[in-house]
Amino acid sequence: MKKNKSTIILILVFFVGLSVMLYPTISDYVNQLHQTRAVANYAADVDKLSDADYTAYFEAADAFNAQIAADPDALYFPDRFPSYESTLDVTGTGIMGYITIEKIGVELPIYHGTSDAVLQVAAGHLEGTSLPVGGASTHAVISAHRGLPSAKLFTNLDQLEVGDTFTITVLDRTLTYEVDNISIVLPTETDSLKVSEGKDYITLMTCTPYGINTHRLLVRGRRITTPDKLKHIRVTSDAIKIEPILTAPIMALPLLLVLLFWLLFAPRKRSSAKDKTHKTH
């Protein structure tokens, strides 16, 4: 009986340890599933729009960006722009588009604002900056967390180098940006996020150093021509990536359950020495 109890305790400890080890991977997988479906649903809703709808949405976004460019303090007073939340909110869920960073395997929906609820699961657009629809004198800022145990998000953003590219898809428009500047600043140093006259920039922002988060990593991209192969990509909700580290434990789980059953219920033979002792009595 004591051996059975010890075996059960050891097995429970093993499974608890395995659960702790797998939590980040499983949580990230669930987040990727949510993100991919959100992007796929967005793309499906966008496909239902007419050319007139596209024109109206982009004209509203361009008008908003003109207001941002005309106000040098827009970043500090985003409340001056009450139309922000409704502009480009095609689905009514707050998604304005999505970002794809092929080098680090990232595809995230972009939501209005950078509330903690948004940044826990996706990328957020920084209020007071241009909407990411491109054009001269625009500078959009897209932010996401890194180092969360539940999601990768921008965890590997520091792997990007000058010359790498990323894309932003809004409605039926896919824009490509080439990284031209990488910097680390204090949270209060925001001048580099302002609009530069005539330039078309998007800056990706996250916390740094990893796990300490006292500064901000800024990866700026300048607009370049989008290759034809990227202009008509459609995302499907089945495009889910399963990490190898998750696959192995899932395959091993049935074997572990069989082992547990055998340890608990397999008949045990007494040793011959004990049998002889009992016979003499």
Each PLM stretch: what is its role?
Residues K2-K3, T277:
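Intrinsic low-complexity, intrinsically disordered segments enriched in polar/basic residues
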Residues K3-P244:
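Solvent-exposed, non-transmembrane regions of membrane-associated and secreted proteins
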Residues R234-H281:
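C-terminal single-pass membrane-anchor helix
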